[in-house]
C-alpha cells in the first residue's frame, strides 16, 4: 500500500491512511506575451519560470480509542511539512504551505479530513550526496537544469569548471559551500559571496564534466536533479 512521507516520517507512523494517491498537476510555465506594434510574427514572449503546484489529499484515521490527542499530533506534523514524497517513487516535493480542512470527528475513534498542499513546481530526485576527488562526468537525469549544492574541501583560491563554465572562490579555509538554489556561498556561518567570481553553477540536462584547479581534496555534491 502506498504511503505518504513528510519530513522523513511516514503516515503509518501516525496510524494515518491516504484515501487514495493524489493526482498532482504539471507546473504551468509563466509566460508574458508582449505586443509590438508593426511586428508581423506575432507577440514577443517572456518566460518567467513556473507556477507553484497545488494538490489535495484526503486522509482517514480509525482506531479503537479516542483519537483526538493523536489528531493534534498529526496536525502539527502536517503543518510543519517541508518535504513530501510517496513510497512508490524516488522523488520528493518541497512544500511551501499546508491548509488542513475541517476534521469530521463526530465519532471519537474516527477522523477524516482533506489537506491542501502548495509545492515548489518541481519534483526532486531522492539521492545521497555524491563525493568526487578527480575530474568526473555526472549525468543529469532530470528534465530541467539543476541548481546544485557543492561543498568544496580545500584551501586558497579554487576554480571549478562545469562544461567549460567556471567560477572562482578565494580565501577558502578548509571548506566552502556553494548553494546555487539559495545563491549563497558560505563557510560555516561566514558569508563568502564577496569571495566568489562568476555565476553560481548549474548542471545542464545530460552530461556535465566537473574539474578544478587549486588545492582541493574533494567535492561533495548534492546535484538536485529535478523534473516537471
Located regions from the model:
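Solvent-exposed edge beta-strands and adjacent loop segments
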Residues: 1-54, 89-103
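A short, compositionally biased
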Residues: 1-2, 77-81, 152-156
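Short, acidic/charged, Gly/Pro-enriched secondary-structure junctions
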Residues: 5, 60-100
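Surface-exposed loop/edge segments in extracytoplasmic proteins
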Residues: 13, 85, 91-95, 159-161, ...
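Short beta-strand and beta-hairpin "edge-sheet" elements
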Residues: 25-26, 83-128
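Oligomerization/assembly interface segments of phage tail-like spikes and tubes
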Residues: 38, 42-65, 109-122, 208
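Solvent-exposed loop and beta-edge segments used for protein-protein assembly and interaction
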Residues: 49-51, 76-78, 107-111, 142-144, ...
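Intrinsically disordered, low-complexity segments enriched in serine, threonine, and glycine
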Residues: 124-228
Amino acid at each position: 500500500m502506498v504511503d505518504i512521507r513528510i519530513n522523513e516520517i511516514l503516515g503509518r507512523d501516525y496510524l494515518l491512511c491516504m484515501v487514495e494517491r493524489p493526482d498532482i498537476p504539471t507546473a504551468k510555465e509563466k509566460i508574458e506575451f508582449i505586443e509590438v506594434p508593426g511586428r508581423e510574427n506575432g507577440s514577443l514572449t517572456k518566460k518567467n519560470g513556473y507556477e507553484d503546484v497545488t494538490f489535495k489529499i484526503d486522509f482517514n484515521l480509525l482506531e479503537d480509542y479516542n483519537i483526538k490527542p493523536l489528531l493534534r499530533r498529526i496536525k502539527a506534523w502536517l503543518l510543519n511539512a517541508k518535504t513530501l514524497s510517496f513510497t512508490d517513487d524516488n522523488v520528493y516535493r518541497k512544500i511551501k504551505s499546508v491548509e488542513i480542512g475541517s476534521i469530521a470527528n463526530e465519532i471519537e475513534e474516527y477522523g477524516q479530513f482533506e489537506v491542501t498542499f502548495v509545492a515548489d513546481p518541481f519534483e526532486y530526485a531522492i539521492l545521497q550526496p555524491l563525493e568526487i576527488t578527480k575530474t568526473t562526468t555526472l549525468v543529469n537525469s532530470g528534465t530541467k537544469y539543476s541548481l546544485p549544492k557543492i561543498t568544496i574541501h580545500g584551501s586558497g583560491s579554487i576554480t571549478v569548471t562545469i562544461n567549460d563554465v567556471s567560477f572562482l572562490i578565494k580565501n577558502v579555509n578548509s571548506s566552502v559551500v556553494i548553494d546555487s538554489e539559495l545563491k549563497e556561498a558560505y563557510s560555516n556561518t561566514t558569508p563568502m559571496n564577496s569571495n566568489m567570481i562568476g555565476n553560481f553553477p548549474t548542471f545542464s540536462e545530460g552530461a556535465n564534466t566537473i574539474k578544478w584547479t587549486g588545492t582541493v581534496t574533494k567535492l561533495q555534491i548534492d546535484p538536485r536533479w529535478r523534473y516537471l
